[in-house]
């Protein structure tokens, strides 16, 4: 698995990029389902499975007083993601400027222009961009505009818990 640090270091084009996005702290079962779904689609299409994540934890920038202790440190998180057959991790520097991006700007500048995403895999409660303005319906709208498909993974239950 290749790890790319910083969005300025993304060097495509990539064969049929299938991307899942999130902080992924803890790399819990729900995250693993997203990674495996992205890897499965990429394998079927002869593409590249990607996880797009952030360093540091977004709350460290947005609301430092609310940042939880990390469940998984960076190197362990990378090991767990790799175990789910992800080909490439893009780790964005989560800065105030990054946090302030509007969802459309992120969709165009990063997802479309830099990565060339073809399919996205997100959880049912996913939101992105400034103030989490980018909802799943909005992401689907961006997919229509920029030419990518969005797969929404429904909640996973284990022992009756979501």
Give, region by region, the residue ranges found by the protein language model.
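Nucleotidyltransferase catalytic core that binds NTPs
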Residues: 1-162
């Amino acid at each position: 698995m290749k790890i790319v640090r910083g969005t300025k270091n993304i060097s495509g084009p990539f064969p049929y990029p299938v991307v899942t996005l999130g902080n992924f702290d803890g790399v819990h079962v729900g995250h693993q389902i997203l990674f495996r779904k992205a890897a499965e689609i990429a394998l079927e299409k002869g593409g590249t499975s990607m996880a797009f994540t952030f360093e540091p934890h977004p709350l460290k920038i947005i609301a430092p007083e609310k940042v939880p202790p990390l469940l998984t440190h960076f190197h362990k998180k990378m090991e767990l993601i790799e175990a789910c057959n992800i080909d490439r991790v893009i780790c964005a520097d989560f800065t105030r400027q990054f946090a302030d991006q509007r969802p459309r700007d992120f969709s165009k500048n990063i997802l479309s222009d830099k990565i060339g995403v073809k399919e996205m895999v997100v959880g049912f409660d996913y939101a992105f961009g400034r103030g989490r303005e980018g909802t799943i319906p909005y992401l689907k709208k961006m997919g229509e505009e920029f030419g990518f498909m969005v797969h929404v993974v429904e909640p996973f239950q284990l022992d009756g818990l979501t």
